[in-house]
Amino acid sequence: MLYSPRLTDQILIVAGEASADLHAARTLHELQRLRPGITAFGVGGPRLREAGLEALAPAEDISVMGLAEVLPRIPRILGILRMLGRAAAERRPRAALLVDLPDFNLRLAARLKKLGIPVVYYVSPTIWAWRQGRAKKIARVVDRMLCILPFEERFYEGTGVSARFVGHPFAERPPPGPAEAYRSALGLPASRTTIAMVPGSRPSELKRLLPPMLQAAERLRAAHPDAQFVVPVAPTLDRAALEPYLAAHRTLEVRLVDGRTEEVVGASDAALVKSGTSTLEAGLMLRPMVVVYKLSWLSYAVARMLVKIAHVALVNILAGRGIVPELLQGDASPERMAAEVEHLLGDRAAREAQIAALREVRASLGEPGAPLRVAEEVLGVMR
């Protein structure tokens, strides 16, 4: 249904990393379709800006992972928090859509609550994994919590949080085609062994993950001389950010692709993927993969004390068991990465078992239509 426009139809949107930027942009498109004339301001990346967001600050300024990484950025992050609070007080948006990024967005939600601005929070914080006490704060400052994982709505029962499972945005994606079709679309030779490497969307992730990935690639090339390696460059990054790492491996054939992570993984025989949303994005392409992640020693020590779950890879969490290998911290070495990928390339039974489990994960994500359901929730709370 279409909603009649009003002169003051303005909303605040805040999205940090690349996946949140994409989810928010698709929701904004649905809002514009349902309520022609609606406008948005806030913080977002390239996709939100293309959708029409008036960006008051770049997304990368607030998208920081890990305690050690956050500390030097605190003054800038707090400055943006104050700036958004002032902008909300001046513009009085009719609602706010805050996407992921809980340490920042829950603080902003508290300020918006004092201003009487309804808050829709999209992509629940992982309170089921750690810091479960945050549910009390969420109940105080968030009007609607929209969950993208099927078990999260049940977790909020009895907490006072108004939560709804809206389906995962990735459920919009059609089933993957054959690897050869993706290779053709990317201009890659169809017959060569193809390995995807997904190092993440933050500079800190590149610094920690891309060098060992490239070293693992050198080892894999020794076993597979025809191998080609493909790296998707996140929209929040510039190709130039990767060049210093590639310079040390000039003889290695590495193809950079702007965005298009799902196509890059779809083109692969196996993939090295950083932990986070990327693991689900890659998993939906039904390609064998190995999940890797490294934090600073301080961030990892804190996480070890606080995290209450057995797995870190989202596909493993959704499956309820370890369906893909996880290499964390010291285990994320070039030797281990290469060995795990080699196992998936050479062991057909292991490869097929992983793909079968990934099919089950894909089926658990709900029906398509998440952006529309989120847009309707935003319109439902607008003052």
Swiss-Prot record:
Name of the featured protein: Lipid-A-disaccharide synthase
Function, in words: Condensation of UDP-2,3-diacylglucosamine and 2,3-diacylglucosamine-1-phosphate to form lipid A disaccharide, a precursor of lipid A, a phosphorylated glycolipid that anchors the lipopolysaccharide to the outer membrane of the cell.
InterPro entries with a match to the protein in the record: Glyco_trans_19
GO cellular component entries: membrane
Record field: transmembrane: none
Organism encoding this protein: Anaeromyxobacter sp. (strain K)
Biological pathway: Bacterial outer membrane biogenesis; LPS lipid A biosynthesis
Species lineage: Bacteria, Pseudomonadati, Myxococcota, Myxococcia, Myxococcales
This enzyme's EC code(s): 2.4.1.182
HAMAP family for the chain: LpxB (MF_00392)
A single GO molecular function term of this UniProt record: phospholipid binding
Family, as annotated: Belongs to the LpxB family.
Catalytic activity: a lipid X + a UDP-2-N,3-O-bis[(3R)-3-hydroxyacyl]-alpha-D-glucosamine = a lipid A disaccharide + UDP + H(+)
Domain of life of the organism encoding this protein: Bacteria
